[in-house]
Amino acid sequence: LPYNPSDKNEICTRDTIKDNYIDNVTTEFQGACGIAAGYPAYIDIEHNEVSHTNYTGISVGYGWTGSATAMTNNQINDNDIHHVVQILADGASIYVLSNQGTGSQMEYNYVHDYSTSKWADYGSNGLYLDEKTSGYTVAHNLMVNSPTNIAQNQTGTNTVTDNGTNPSGAQNTMATAGIEASYAAVKKLTITPAKF
């Protein structure tokens, strides 16, 4: 059954994931994603840099259903995603799944520099609207050195326009996607792993 609880307090709502540097986080659990949200509503995932993952960079949605779910108005914009899906397959820089209501957007993301793993028996994608994905506007995403720009698998109603290697505003997207200048120092932090 699609996840759409009558108690709306159970739904992850209005979360913001912004200005994060997420790099090399899938070493132990290769099927993990840089950022993953199962059934969010009104989530904002923006201005992040996600890189060096063994599977998908950003994943939003679950359930493989065209029926109404708790998801609506999800925003995945202005992210810089590169060197992802390095070992596994059937993933993407940005992967979305199932009916996501209305008003969801995937815009002005810069997806670049990755290829299908030599161990994979199936491809990977820049943007992947998987089974029953609906409710999205997918526009102005720049994809450079990407084996497949956009894949759509049994999707519902979406608006997909002006994406690829030269969408309108490509130079601006390249310059502004990812971590905003006021948070750039996050990439210089050194974190010492705990010793077990």
Task: Describe the function of each predicted region.
Residues 60, 116-118, 147-150:
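Noncatalytic linker/hinge segments flanking ATPase motor cores
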Residues 8, 18, 118, 132, ...:
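Context-gated lysine
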Residues 33-36, 59, 63, 103-105, ...:
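Compositionally biased, intrinsically disordered low-complexity regions
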Residues 1-8, 28-37, 54-66, 88-98, ...:
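Extracellular beta-strand/beta-solenoid scaffold signature
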Residues 1-3, 7-26, 41-55, 68-85, ...:
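Right-handed parallel beta-helix
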Residues 62, 131, 152-154:
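A cross-domain feature marking catalytic cores of carbohydrate-active enzymes
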Residues 104, 145-146, 150-196:
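Acidic, glycine- and Ser/Thr-rich low-complexity intrinsically disordered tracts
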